[in-house]
Amino acid sequence: YLQRLYSVVKEEDPAGLVTYVNYPTTEYLRLPFLDFACFNVYLESQDRFEAYLARLQNIVGDRPLLMSELGLDSLRNGEEGQAHSLEWQVRSALGGGCAGVFVFAWTDDWYRHGHDVEDWEFGLTRVDRTPKPALAAVETAFANVPFPAGLPWPRVSVVVCSYNGSRTIRDTLEGLARLRYPDYEVIVVDDGSRDSTAAIAKEYDCVLIRTENRGLSNARNTGLAKATGEIVAYIDDDAYPDPDWLTYLAATFLTTPHAGVGGPNLAPPGDGPIAECVARAPGGPLHVLLTDTVAEHIPGCNMAFRKAWLDVIGGFDPQFRTAGDDVDLCWRLQSRGWTLGFHPAAVVWHHRRNSLRTYWRQQIGYGRAGAMLELKWPEKYNGPGHVRWG
């Protein structure tokens, strides 16, 4: 029924965005045809609200999440209590990666079936439209999105390793130039390219390091050695970041003890039918979560680490020349008792292979890397040779 309604709307307005307002009690409804997801959530505990928000982000997957209702009744909680709660609700929702928030409601002047509603007061204003403290609190929260100004943002070094990446690296560097983050540098490691990768990199504000071709892990370590940031973030040369990518990664480092943090890598639209099929095929670069916010694996196209901890473990293992280095690094960090985090809004757009030939070649490389990982980490594999995640 809901899909039929969706189709009717799309017939009338093909460019319009369609959603369905859902509730926690019916979160089991999987509606992948919707353009974005909406939930009404009323929770008075900040910890529980943030935990449930993380759950919802994983339920909705690649689609934007909108908080279509949140609020608190001042009749039972007091006007100051309402103001305090609404401020953290808005901050938590936007800091947790929601695309937007609706606060319920504007005024206490409310009707139902032609009668005044007098047993609750959810409004930001009173019946006479005079503002309650919640109005100023919400205004303050919305004025500082996705995070309050003045946080002690760490310096971040973004490392881009490239081998013959001239076809896509310009998009990567353009995206990095548009980042909304106060303190970062870009380091491009040209791993012996024979195309125009280096010439393109020279057009941008970045540190360019040219080496002979020594493989991906060595290139990552070269960038690590040059990095001046407290955090080192890695993005592939066939990906480009959301403008707030570093902000969400860094915010997670500020609020958790994680050794590393990653986020989703989504296939950009318009890459063609083969790339779209590859994006849906098995064997892609996906994160592996242990909980809604803790990961076992964050893929190399979108990962960031505390530099000091990378230095402690000696960086990336050079034997992994094309793939597998990210998995090995994640396991080595966790073997020391450290954890990896995940933020659903730390998004990069990652081009998939757009031909069967390049996809097949990629999968061969992944297979070789998997065999190397099994030799190094036999306890991580079962009898048939499959990884036992978690």
Where are these regions (language model features)?
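Aromatic-rich peripheral "rim/lid" segments of glycoside hydrolase catalytic domains that contact
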Residues: 104-152
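Glycine-rich, basic loop-to-helix element that forms the pyrophosphate-binding segment
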Residues: 211-227, 289, 293, 301
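A conserved acidic beta->alpha catalytic loop
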Residues: 175, 190-199, 239
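Short, acidic, metal-binding catalytic loop of nucleotide-sugar glycosyltransferases
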Residues: 174-183
